[in-house]
Amino acid sequence: EKINAVNLEKMYEVLKFVEYGGYCRRSMDCVHGMLLIDRMKNEAVVDKAVLFGWFRKMAVCAEQYERCGEGQNYKYLNPYGIVLSDEGEVLFLDTESRENAEVMKQMQKRAVRSHFIRPVYEMDTCGSREPDLFGYGNTLRFMLAYMKVVPALTKREEIRLFRICGKCIGETRKKYSSFLQV
């Protein structure tokens, strides 16, 4: 078993999505990897191509989750709810698994909830997909603030990411209404 020097890698129960003939099905799996938050704390430097790949994969997972759940939100789109597998996959933590109870406790803390979950009074006025878009936008912002990207982002990339985050969070007049727009 491959063990990280600081022993952060372990087994997690995650959600996987299977695409078949235009349909999407959700399944559960157990993978070896680490939480995104642990990766960020342990190694704050990330390759630009890898980071952009993570951003894309998170958006794809969120879109697949919504299609499989008939528009249902994941609700835990934050660095604690994302697992990076040893194979390089970006996966959503299975929030209903007893094996992930310790991580779920971390996600229930006020500091995590207040940063990544849209306030209740705003939820009443937003569409069904906006809570996950809000979490996605704040997760991107958190990652960009916390991690050093190598090679550095160009000014154009910074502006583009700033706009994407703003549209996800709802800080601009033009908001995303679906992950297909991201």
Segments from the language model and where they lie:
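A conserved short helix/loop substructure at the end of the activation segment
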Residues: 169-181
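C-lobe/activation-segment region of protein kinase-like
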Residues: 85-167
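Conserved structural core of kinase catalytic domains
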Residues: 4-52
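Extracytoplasmic/periplasmic ligand-binding sensor domains
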Residues: 3-8, 20, 35, 57-61, ...
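Short amphipathic C-terminal alpha-helix that caps PH/PH-like domains
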Residues: 55-58, 137-144, 182
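Short, solvent-exposed loop/helix junctions and linker helices
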Residues: 48, 52, 127-133, 176
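Short, structured interface segments
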Residues: 21, 91-93, 180-182
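Catalytic-loop of the protein kinase fold
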Residues: 54-55, 59-99
